[in-house]
């Protein structure tokens, strides 16, 4: 009840305020004015036309939603897939994840990255024998072709990706 009263007083004081006076009043009133414009286009200057560019963003990283999604987007993928098994509470995962995403993005679509949270998808973690995080799998044509556990530097990640793409 007291919160409603306070909110009501605040809103009425904000709404009932007078416009600013003095130097700032002249600045705000002139800067907010629009030039006169005749619908016939003979007087005044219309604002320039706005252009919007709509290009499709190609994402190289995605979060796995469930088992069928993993099957469809990872196992059945024609493109090689790097699968990052991670957890929200895992410190090393927070370091490796962005590093790995950056390295995958540099491959320009030759490889994609799937992120699997082991707390949300324990069935996938068990199926792929993930015993520690971060665990990264390289999957090509539905088969695991390489794997590592822990943090790697960028040179090691690049070699890992080249081996997968190769």
Curated annotation (Swiss-Prot):
> Which locations, inside or outside the cell, does it occupy?
Mitochondrion
- N6-acetyllysine, modified sites: 152
- Annotated family: Belongs to the thioredoxin family.
Residues with the N6-succinyllysine modification: 152
Q: Name one GO molecular function term.
A: protein-disulfide reductase activity
The keyword Magnesium is annotated on this UniProt entry: no
Q: The Thioredoxin domain covers which part of the protein?
A: 61-166
Q: Where in the sequence is the active site? A: 90, 93
One GO BP annotation is: response to axon injury
What Pfam family is a match, any one? Thioredoxin
Q: Where is this site: Contributes to redox potential value?
A: 91-92
Kindly list the cysteine pairs connected by disulfide bridges: 90-93
Record key words, sorted: Acetylation, Disulfide bond, Electron transport, Mitochondrion, Redox-active center, Transit peptide, Transport
Q: Where is this site: Deprotonates C-terminal active site Cys?
A: 84
Q: Give a Gene Ontology cellular component term annotated to this protein.
A: neuronal cell body
Complex and partners: Monomer.
Q: Which gene encodes it?
A: Txn2
Q: What is this protein called?
A: Thioredoxin, mitochondrial
Return the transit peptide range from the UniProt record: 1-59
Q: In which tissues is it expressed?
A: Expressed in several tissues with the highest expression levels in heart, muscle, kidney and adrenal gland.
Q: What does this protein do?
A: Important for the control of mitochondrial reactive oxygen species homeostasis, apoptosis regulation and cell viability. Is involved in various redox reactions including the reduction of protein disulfide bonds, through the reversible oxidation of its active center dithiol to a disulfide.
